[in-house]
Curated annotation (Swiss-Prot):
Name of protein: Intrastrand cross-link recognition protein
InterPro entries in alphabetical order: HMG_box_dom, HMG_box_dom_sf, HMGB
CDD domains xref list: HMG-box_ABF2_IXR1-like_rpt2, HMG-box_IXR1-like_rpt1
Organism encoding this protein: Saccharomyces cerevisiae (strain ATCC 204508 / S288c)
DNA-binding region ranges: 361-429, 434-502
GO biological process: cellular response to hypoxia; negative regulation of transcription by RNA polymerase II; regulation of nucleotide-excision repair; regulation of ribosome biogenesis
Classification via Pfam families: HMG_box
Length: 597
């Protein structure tokens, strides 16, 4: 098909020369231009062509309003003649896609197909007179040219198709360098002479096959461009990237700086930095530097926090170790130097008397212990491997087998030893400080208890104690005062036996007065409370009976008296150890016995 135009003037009519299907979902900015821009496209470079498009976004709103008004006034505009200056240029106006014009009946579809066929035939038969037939409503706005004639302009969808064809044409010319000047006119003449051959060759051309997927007008424009030949008016073409992710085109990003900024900010887009506007490149690099600095600061802060936490943890561990070490040292010091609990004056006197009494003569061993020690050597000869528990069991078994006559000599020996012990004990206790005197109520109980027991022989200890408490409450206050005075005198005598705790003048300290007052108050409280009388009275009675039993035993052995003042404590302990060794070696020897039955 011979169009009669030069390759310099076919960039507005070529829709898609790379055999790529048209994507109608792409949205482009509605840029409107005069026809003179498309006629004079051969005298412009690609950069000038882009600069012209960058100046148009300000007029978009006004042109859209004009387009709406013209669509309402004239549904179709057609059969316009070109000026003599435009007869050498064949302008194609492809029909919009079916998504824009949706016919409601089959008759409208048939009319549209007939109009498209007439349009293609008119373009192929004549190069001088070009008539555009049956232009749809979407293309119904007109622009005034320099010659005064009205020509249809291009809407947004048509411009997107022309734009794709322009980029495709640039990429094709880049691979196939073309000739300029007279070479372009010679190619035009050869194309005019070979119209039929060009039409026949489009069926086998891949561009024609790709154009079949588009609308008929776009396919016709692609076939005309293939017939025109590879000649082009461009000698050096820029590197242009055709497609980009997320349906973003390189030229649209270059035309609108705001869209380029959005594309650079989107993580899913990958626009090359060379295609961005010059003013955005330093901004992006500065932003990246700021982000890197922020990341470095965050990392430094995290490292500092980790170091601080580690230091705190180490300090805590050191403090714990120091506390443990200090605690161990305190325990060792306590073990080496045990802390002696400070006792009151009364308690210290009682404890001192107990310790002194333990250092005195020991009680004699019983008849059973004397028998077991007498047969110990015999048992060791019979059972040399037997231990002490086994020997004691054998001795007890033999003791049970003895009759009373056989046990009598052992009991007589015990009586003689007891008489000796009693004499020595009494002499030793005279050297000891006296016992702490009992309170007034305990003195009254010790005196009245034998009479109460004779009067009530059938009653028990608790009932007898209650009777004594009732008599104490009924007692005359004058007699109670006498018991109190006797208690005070005995207490002073008891305190005088501990001169180291008195004042330098020999007067008792304040602790003794406190102890005396506590005993008096305790006696009065005991008399007021009947329940506490029973326990205290029973203990007092037991102490009295125990002292009487010791004093009334006639068979106590007599031994030479021993005084603590003559022998120090260490010598007495050594003597006790020697006596124990002697008993183990010879059980028949006389002396103090450690263990009682």
């Amino acid at each position: 098909m011979n169009t009669g135009i030069s390759p310099k003037q076919d960039d507005a009519s070529n829709s898609n020369l790379l055999n790529i299907g048209q994507d109608h979902s792409l949205q482009y900015q509605g840029l409107e231009h005069n026809d003179s821009q498309y006629r004079d496209a051969s005298h412009q470079t690609p950069h000038q062509y882009l600069n012209q498009f960058q100046a148009q976004p300000q007029q978009q709103q006004q042109q859209q309003q004009q387009q709406q008004q013209q669509q309402q006034q004239a549904p179709y505009q057609g059969h316009f003649q070109q000026s003599p200056q435009q007869q050498q240029q064949n302008v194609y106006y492809p029909l919009p896609p079916q998504s824009l014009t949706q016919p409601t009946s089959q008759s409208q579809q048939q009319q549209q197909q007939q109009q498209q066929q007439q349009y293609a035939n008119s373009n192929s038969n004549s190069n001088n007179n070009v008539n555009v037939n049956a232009l749809p409503q979407d293309f119904g706005y007109m622009q005034q040219t320099g010659s005064g004639q009205n020509y249809p302009t291009i809407n947004q969808q048509q411009f997107s198709e022309f734009y794709n064809s322009f980029l495709s044409h640039l990429t094709q010319k880049q691979t196939n360098p073309s000739v300029t000047g007279t070479g372009a006119s010679s190619n035009n003449n050869s194309n005019n002479n070979n119209v039929s051959s060009g039409n026949n060759s489009t069926s086998s051309n891949p561009a024609q096959l790709a154009a079949s997927q588009l609308n008929p007008a776009t396919a016709a424009a692609a076939a005309a461009n293939n017939a025109a030949g590879p000649a082009s008016y461009l000698s050096q073409l820029p590197q242009v990237q055709r497609y980009y992710p997320n349906n973003m085109n390189a030229l649209s990003s270059l035309l609108d700086p705001s869209s380029a900024g959005n594309a650079a900010g989107n993580a899913n887009t990958a626009t090359h930095p060379g295609l961005l506007p010059p003013n955005l490149q330093p901004q992006l690099t500065h932003h990246q530097q700021q982000m890197q600095q922020q990341l470095q600061l965050q990392q430094q802060q995290q490292l500092q926090q980790q170091q601080q936490l580690q230091q705190q943890h180490q300090l805590q561990q050191q403090q714990q170790l120091q506390q443990q070490h200090h605690h161990l040292q305190q325990q060792q010091q306590q073990q080496q130097h045990p802390v002696v609990k400070k006792l009151s004056s009364t308690q210290s006197r009682i404890e001192r008397r107990k310790q002194l009494k333990k250092q005195g003569p020991k009680r004699p061993s019983s008849a059973y212990f004397l028998f077991s020690m007498s047969i110990r050597n015999e048992l060791l000869q019979q059972f040399p491997e037997a231990k002490v528990p086994e020997l004691s069991k054998l001795a007890s078994a033999r003791w049970k087998e003895l009759t009373d006559d056989q046990k009598k000599p052992f009991y007589e020996e015990f009586r003689t030893n007891w008489e000796k012990y009693r004499v020595v004990r009494d002499a030793y206790e005279k050297t000891l400080p006296p016992k702490r005197p009992s309170g007034p109520f305990i003195q009254f109980t010790q005196e009245i208890r034998p009479t109460v027991v004779k009067e009530n022989p059938d009653k028990g200890l608790i009932e007898i104690t209650k009777i004594i408490g009732e008599r104490w409450r009924e007692l005359d206050p004058a007699k109670k005062a006498e018991y109190t005075e006797t208690y005070k005198k005995r207490l002073k005598e008891w305190e005088s036996c501990y001169p180291d705790e008195n004042d330098p003048n020999g007067n008792p300290t304040g602790h003794s007065h406190k102890a005396m007052n506590m005993n008096l108050n305790m006696d009065t409280k005991i008399m007021e409370n009947q329940d506490s009388i029973e326990h205290i009275t029973a203990n007092a009675i037991d102490s009295v009976t125990g002292s009487n039993s010791n004093s009334t035993n006639p068979n106590t052995p007599v031994s030479p008296p021993i005084s603590l003042q003559q022998q120090p404590l260490q010598q007495q302990q050594q003597q006790q150890q020697q006596q124990q060794h002697m008993l183990l070696a010879d059980p028949t020897t006389n002396g103090s016995i450690i263990k009682n039955e």
